[in-house]
């Protein structure tokens, strides 16, 4: 049966909606089995790849990966948000390919946020070193960037590419369970994350969304309750 559900434990069993499908792709050397994992709204899932790499997928994400890695690189494709703990292998770099950027590592832990169709994407590094290749488009020039721990690269169709220093562990705390932590983040960025988690469109005037910043941590609150969670830290 190619369609089934699984969870991360009893806490998630009722809310995790995951579809696992196997696609057979014919190649000259024979058949290669490709797996596609999709997570539903308000759900997460974990995947262990053939090389031992651990991947945690957040809500509304899709990961495509081979049953076995072959060739010079270990390549996977991502649309969404995922945290990677990559098994070191200097002779076979690990590459996460997205619609906006390619992230190459040898062995490290990092997060990629890049949904197909969105105008923004991020890479956050916790440990080790990664090289981010931002893909060139009609609206944005590409480029190559090497990140150090606690650095975040942000790609924006309107604002270009930026590098900032953050607390990467806190920023990626969603992987520890149904929890998201925001520290002095713009309302615009927060609403984007909440839309992905709850699967609902949240409308807010652009001049307000970009004007205020919030600091708070959410666990498994309803979307309605989050409306009253915090006062803005200050406009900038």
Regions found by a protein language model. Give the residues of each.
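A residue-level detector for the "anchor" residue at the start of short, highly conserved motifs
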Residues: 6, 10-230, 234
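Short, well-ordered junction/capping motifs at the entry into regular secondary structure
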Residues: 1-2
């Amino acid at each position: 049966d190619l369609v089934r559900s699984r969870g991360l434990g009893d806490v998630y069993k009722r809310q995790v909606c995951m579809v696992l499908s196997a696609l057979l792709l014919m190649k000259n050397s024979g058949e290669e089995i490709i797996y596609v994992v999709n997570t539903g709204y308000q759900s997460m899932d974990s995947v262990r790849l053939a090389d031992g790499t651990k991947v945690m997928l957040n809500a509304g994400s899709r990961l495509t990966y081979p049953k076995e890695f072959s060739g010079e690189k270990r390549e996977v494709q991502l649309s969404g948000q995922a945290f990677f703990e990559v098994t070191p292998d200097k002779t076979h770099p690990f590459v996460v390919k997205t619609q906006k950027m390619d992230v190459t590592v040898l062995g490290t832990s990092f997060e990629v946020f890049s949904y197909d169709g969105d105008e923004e994407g991020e890479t956050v590094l916790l440990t080790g070193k990664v090289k981010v290749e931002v893909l060139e488009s009609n609206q944005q020039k590409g480029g190559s960037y090497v990140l150090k721990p606690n650095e975040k690269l942000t790609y924006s169709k309107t604002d270009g590419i930026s590098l900032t220093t953050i607390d990467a562990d806190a920023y990626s705390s969603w992987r520890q369970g149904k929890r998201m932590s925001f520290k002095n983040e713009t309302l615009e960025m927060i609403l984007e994350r909440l839309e992905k988690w709850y699967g609902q469109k949240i409308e807010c005037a652009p001049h307000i969304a970009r004007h205020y910043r919030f600091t708070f941590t959410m666990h498994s609150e309803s979307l309605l309750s989050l409306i009253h969670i915090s006062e803005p830290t200050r406009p900038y």
